[in-house]
UniProtKB/Swiss-Prot annotation:
Encodes the substrate-binding domain of a transcriptional regulator. It comes from the Bacteria. Gene3D superfamilies: Periplasmic binding protein-like II (3.40.190.10). The gene is yagP. Pfam families: LysR_substrate (PF03466). It comes from Escherichia coli (strain K12). This is Putative LysR family substrate binding domain-containing protein YagP. InterPro entries: LysR_subst-bd (IPR005119). Belongs to the LysR transcriptional regulatory family. Disulfide bonds: none annotated.
Length: 136
């Protein structure tokens, strides 16, 4: 199930981003590992998809750290909407440029179709299914 991507900023920190190419604001970047290129932020405009290579003040592979930094006013960051939903709804974070952000295709869970699935895997499968239904 597709999920909206959201660009977020701590409430009260300003909003202009795309016009400047994203490089005049403090940004919090994501990098899966040192061997992988930093994540480029995806955008859509007039049916055209493009992405920006940002110049972050800090780069991390820890989503919780990204969230804490954003909440502390450390910069703009990007993730799926469900990651930041409670903070946007409470007004602690502000969603930016919603009209320019693409849909994230979603996560997939691959597992063997056997009768005797290990109880821990069955619990994970059931949890993920329930979690996705709550988001729908």
């Amino acid at each position: 199930m597709p999920a909206p991507v959201v660009l977020i900023l701590a409430a009260g920190r300003g909003e202009c981003f795309l016009a400047s190419g994203g490089n005049t604001h403090k940004c919090i970047g994501w990098r899966q590992s040192p061997e992988v290129a930093p994540y480029r932020w995806p955008f859509e405009e007039n049916g055209r998809t493009f992405d920006l290579a940002i110049e972050p003040q800090i780069t991390t592979n820890d989503l919780r750290l990204m969230l804490r930094l954003a909440l502390a006013g450390g910069g703009i960051t990007i993730a799926t909407q469900e990651t930041f939903r409670p903070y946007i709804e409470s007004g602690k974070l502000v969603s930016l440029l919603d009209d320019f952000l693409p849909q994230f295709p979603g996560f997939y869970l691959y597992f063997p179709q056997r009768r005797n699935i290990a109880p821990k895997l069955r619990a994970l499968i059931d949890y993920v299914k329930e979690w996705r239904q709550q988001l729908a």
